[in-house]
Amino acid sequence: MNLSRKLNAPASFIYNKLIESSIHDINASINRGLSPDEIKGFKYEKTFLSGHKATIHIVDVVENELYQFKTTTSIREFVTTYKIKELSSNQCEVTCTETIESHGPMLKYNDMLTGAVLGWSKRKQLKKVLDAMAATYK
């Protein structure tokens, strides 16, 4: 999946929203406080509402420019990257990419089919999330 979106908010604001969300998720999973400076390279286990578990690894962070994490389950590995480009003092462009690597040929085939069918839905949802973040900027 690949999506680029111009937002009416500074790059620093959107970056901080992404990091705050990540820190909230991490702190809920490990039951202790973690600062933004500590998240690069951090790994933790997350249990989803469905009961499935995944290991989340914060791969890279570059202040106001990049946030990348890897989600690993028993059958798939997702790498999600948010690149933030400052366009002006009150506008930025966010490019989100997600790659999926499945373990096994049948899963890879299934991912190709479902990705083609459901990819638009995922992009639509991501647009809503990014727009909601930008809407909180004043």
Regions found by a protein language model. Give the residues of each.
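Hydrophobic ligand-binding cavity/cleft-lining segments
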Residues: 1-38
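Short, surface-exposed coil-to-beta transition loops
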Residues: 1-2, 51-56, 77-81
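A short, structured loop/turn motif at beta-sheet edges
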Residues: 8-12, 59-64, 83-93, 137-138
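Beta-strand elements of well-folded, non-transmembrane domains
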Residues: 9-11, 50, 100-104
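Hydrophobic pocket/interface hotspot
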Residues: 14-18, 58, 69, 94-96, ...
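Short, highly charged C-terminal tails/helix-capping segments
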Residues: 31-36, 130-138
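Short beta-strand segments that buttress and anchor functional surface loops
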Residues: 42-49, 67-73
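Beta-strand/loop substructures that line and gate deep hydrophobic ligand-binding cavities in soluble
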Residues: 74-124
